[in-house]
């Protein structure tokens, strides 16, 4: 038997909102430590990793390891029904074929079931890596910068150095350049061994930035030989990490 109760529906709604347009399906691996998920998008360009700690739930029970394979599109339809102030109980029977969601808001209790999928799951290992650059900034400001950049071009050039972080975009209507310096109260450089510059698909960064309501700050990791990493620490709940492969720049052409 698996049961996990969120104190409010806000976290679940915002998590699903973050990756509903990015991932077709996901496997939630449940054990006595909590709920985890690692899923790549269909283009194998982006990876989303989620860890929800057992102690972060109002109530948590997991008698045995349970993988729950769900359609993200279907899950998003159920989550739309929840009030952010409602408590949310997720539960599933061992060897069952559905996952139940119970939304409790004062005098109204709503129960919805979601059919589980039968899919082959590839368990991915994410090694601990030593990144060249690590910066810390406001998650809302990061989301705004990504949105602004994509008004000019689909691709965003990101550079990280001891001086700070720079976002650039060059398009048909003109160009955009935003620089975050270390003296900004909402920004800090935690580590900068060398200057790192990569080009990324702006759409993916904007998808990741939807997680801004989950945490006030985001930590950005960059290296020449490693994927771009965003990490949101969800207070008292867990960690959401998003990875994105840079685009390969070859003369005037860019391909993944």
Swiss-Prot record:
Extract the GO molecular function terms from the UniProt entry. Answer: DNA binding; DNA polymerase processivity factor activity
Asked if the Swiss-Prot or TrEMBL record annotates the protein with the keyword DNA-binding, the reply is yes
- A Pfam family found in this protein is PCNA_C
Q: Which residues bind DNA?
A: 61-80
Q: A GO BP term, please?
A: mismatch repair
Residue pairs linked by disulfide bridges in the UniProt entry:
none
List the keywords (alphabetical): DNA replication, DNA-binding, Early protein
Q: InterPro entries from the xrefs?
A: DNA_clamp_sf, Pr_cel_nuc_antig, Pr_cel_nuc_antig_C, Pr_cel_nuc_antig_CS, Pr_cel_nuc_antig_N
Q: Known SUPFAM superfamilies for this protein?
A: DNA clamp
Into which family does the record put it?
Answer: Belongs to the PCNA family.
Per its database record, what is this protein's job?
Stimulates the viral DNA replication. The virus utilizes both cellular and viral PCNAs during viral DNA replication in order to produce budded virus (BV). In addition, stimulates the expression of late genes 38K and VP39 by promoting the transcription of IE2.
Q: What is this protein called?
A: Probable DNA polymerase sliding clamp
């Amino acid at each position: 038997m698996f049961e996990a109760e969120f104190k409010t529906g806000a976290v679940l709604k915002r998590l699903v909102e973050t990756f509903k347009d990015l991932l077709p399906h996901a496997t939630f691996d449940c054990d006595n430590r909590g709920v985890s998920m690692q899923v790549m998008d269909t283009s194998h360009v982006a990876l989303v990793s989620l860890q929800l700690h057992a102690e972060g739930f109002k109530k948590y029970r997991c008698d045995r390891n349970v993988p729950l394979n769900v359609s993200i599109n279907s899950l998003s339809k159920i989550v739309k029904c929840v009030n952010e102030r409602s408590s949310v109980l997720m539960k599933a029977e061992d060897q069952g074929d559905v996952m139940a969601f119970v939304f409790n808001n004062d005098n109204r209790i709503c129960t919805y079931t979601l059919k589980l999928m039968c899919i082959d799951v590839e368990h991915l290992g994410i090694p601990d890596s030593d990144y060249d650059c690590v910066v810390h900034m406001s998650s809302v400001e990061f989301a705004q910068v990504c949105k602004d950049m994509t008004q000019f071009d689909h691709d965003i050039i990101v550079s990280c150095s001891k001086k700070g972080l720079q976002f650039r975009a060059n398009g048909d209507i003109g160009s955009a350049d935003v620089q975050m310096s270390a003296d900004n109260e909402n920004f800090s450089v935690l580590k900068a061994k060398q200057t790192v510059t990569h080009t990324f698909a702006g759409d993916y960064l904007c998808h990741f930035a939807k997680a801004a309501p989950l945490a006030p700050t985001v930590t950005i990791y960059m290296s020449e030989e490693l994927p771009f990493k965003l990490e949101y620490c969800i207070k008292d709940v867990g960690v959401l990490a998003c990875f994105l492969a840079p685009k390969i720049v070859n003369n005037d052409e860019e391909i993944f």
